[in-house]
Amino acid sequence: MSGPARNLPMRRTRRRRIALLCTLAMAFAGLAATTVGSPATAADSPVAHGSVNQVWATDLPPDATVALLDQAGTTVQSKKVDAQGGVLFREVAAGPGYRLRLPGQVESAPVTVHDDAAEPWDDSVYDQTIKPDGYGYLTTRDGTQLAYTVHLPTHPATLGIGVPSELENILPNLGLPYLPPYPTLIEYSGYATATPKGPESGIAVIANLMGFAVVDVSMRGTGCSGGAFDFFETMQNLDAYDVIETVARQPWVKGHKVGMMGISYGGISQLFAAQYNPPSLAAIAPLSTIASVPTTLFPGGYLNTGFALNWALDRVADSKPASATTGQPYAWEQIQAGDTTCAANQAMHGQALDLLAKIKANQHYVPATADPLDPVTFVHKIKTPVFMACQWEDEQTGGYCPVLARHMTGTDKKWFTFTNGVHTDSLDPATLNRMFDFFQLYVADEAPNLKSILLKGTAPLIMQQAFGLPQGDTVTLPSDPIQGKLTYDAALKAFEALPRVTVRFDNGAGDQTPGNPVAAYEHTYSAMPVPEQQATTWYMGKNGALSPSKPGQTSVTGYTSDAKATPATNFTGNTGAGGLWGNASQWSWNWVQHPDSGTGATKNTAVSFVTDPLTTDTTVVGTGAAYLNLRSSTPDVDLMATITEVRPDGTETYVQSGYVRASNRVLDHTDSSHMKQASTELEPILSLRAADVHTMPKDTFTPVAVPLYYQGHAYRAGSRIRVTISAPHGDQPIWAFDSTEPGKPSQVAIATGPVGEKKQDNPMSRLVLPVIPDQSIPTDYPPCPSLRNQPCRTYQAIDNPVLPGEVVYAALPKQKSTSTPSSGSGGTSSGSNASPAGHADAVSAGGAASSQTDGADSLPSTGSSVTWTALLAALAAVVLGTQLWTAGRFGHRRMRRGAGTIAR
């Protein structure tokens, strides 16, 4: 959700961070300097506006207390007007007759508050005119004005870093019929999307070069758009509905239908909009999206203080009223240039919801709050055709997007592409080709053969700018059979015959230049999870063994859980275009080995288990888990499982990670879990509910599952599979995490082999991965380095210590959720759809052993062993730039000024 922007000068960056910290401390009390309009006096009658479960007003006297009255005259809410003269009442029941009352008994006229039905209460709002080129404002159903810019294919947008003048010369000379009406796409996000210079973090230019008009729209509460910001609230989603229907009615829009396109924020927003199925929405193509908030913000139950928290801080900063130092820079530029509408629209920006308080209040899964924000809970409602692309190792949104494929059941016209790589690799040449075909067929209603000429001609320029490749590194589009069809019907038939899931392997090794965004080969499947997948188990054993055979003897090993043992992140350079997104020559990996003296658990900071060399090629596609029988010296401990490939040449390649806070170890075996599916052996789903939080039992081993994120990796015969268990940190470019450690590191012990009184009947520590049987690997080992977002290094063995002592074993506490158990979902084989063996039985058996905290079974009410005060202290350090990031490393994705990014 970030991109290659110009860094702020250090002084301005520091000033904005300090300003943000002060704002947080004063509860967002309206410190912005912008003055909009002339605030009303107490004698003026306020003008109220009824919205969807909201009432709002502007031009009110600052600091006045305003009451919201229902039809009976009863005060249902009251609050103070902010410094901009705005007030917003949320969570208001639908109904007529609401009024606002100012001091002195001055009241507004009555207004109606509406429910969240998709259809507007007055569809004449869609009759407004949208000019076919340039900048303007569109009015939504509740009167809020959204800023937009229309980019026609004859006047392409930019990537925010400028499109060379040769494009201006290409278009007129191709003889392409770029005449109205135009096939049209909408790009919708909370970044500076509508800026006339070209969208920040947008990809409108790519659609322009495909022959599409693009309408770039800024969400309410951002930039020059009116309204107040709240992360994907209902009104933001209904605004998208209104934008779609309004744009589709314009005479310059071909077929009076539109598609949606965008990457990251602009991809996620499509899922939220499409759940309402606007009648004029023809297709969506979400790229590099999230699946749920927890899998990005709270992986495994602990806070992502790296990218995710900083992204939230960016949203807080961007949603403030525009001034010389706050809000989105383009809005201030517009105001300074005389844009009175933009100035007036700042009046509600001070009513933005406190996003940091929302994070604090939802550290655990609360369905009523979380489900509306998690695409996995509602994508089944989407009926429009879908093209989606995501990366297993996406350094920003994370690798859980593929789970959406199994839940997107509302349409049979859906195609998914998955690969290893970085955030922008959903724009790799092969994926871009296929997305172009999709839009041509479902939005333009045209065969893609003619306009593909321009796309192929400009692709090297697009690739160079999107990924920041060096001059002379030319990446072109591959041949495409769909584009060879001469008629629309033939092209559509060929496209719809494509398998629904494409997995590209060894991305970065398919071009003569190592690291270019080109995969070595691909396989296709009918669904995700792959129906043929087999849950394949390797058991952990003594001396770091990882074997398909169960160990006959019990052994104990361990390590010191120390979050500071490795750097917080594994990349030291620019994490955008020209750095992490570039080719191998531009990478700056710092993937550090864990310290290991080999002399005991008090000095080791990790343990690892590694297989013998594989005798056959082994392809893994899907999730998986490390199941551990674990003991901790502290009431809680954070765990990270890292999967790597150890090659015969002595190098080690990163594959994927998984996370869990041990107090969140209870699994959810119902289809009402936060992922809306029950736990299986291959995909254990953490409950994450506060009621299911339990400290670790004292001096006792207990089962803990570490769910792995999605992966797609080819292990060639002769390679070995390794799993390393440690504290979080050091395996991600920009993800970092808070810590449970209460002043000193935890001593963690892992029991391998049979445990407990029942021995072989109890679960053993093991690694389970989804292996696709009989899958060919047609290429040789990729160079090291070359795989995108999969760093490699020289393999270094860890000497797991052997620890003495008795193995006392206890099952997990019972799950306290009361939902009906599910039989699971998704077709698999060889038991891969069964509940996690042993661990599932432990959950239902119940009975926690004695607690680390004098018998108290649960952690404090926050559900975390880190207090919110401590978290705010860590947050302050982040904001002031003294903790995880320096301005040079993270500034390009924090507090941006001006256009300069393709995706965030």
Where are the model-predicted features located?
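C-terminal, loop-rich substrate-recognition/catalytic regions characterized by aromatic stacking residues
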Residues: 429-443, 447-817
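Accessory cap/linker subdomain of secreted extracellular hydrolases
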Residues: 148, 197-201, 209, 272-382, ...
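Cap/lid segment of the alpha/beta-hydrolase catalytic domain
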Residues: 155-249, 603, 641, 647-648, ...
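N-terminal cap/lid segment of alpha/beta-hydrolase-fold proteins
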Residues: 117-180, 614-616
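Short beta-strand/loop motif that positions the catalytic acidic residue
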Residues: 382, 388-390
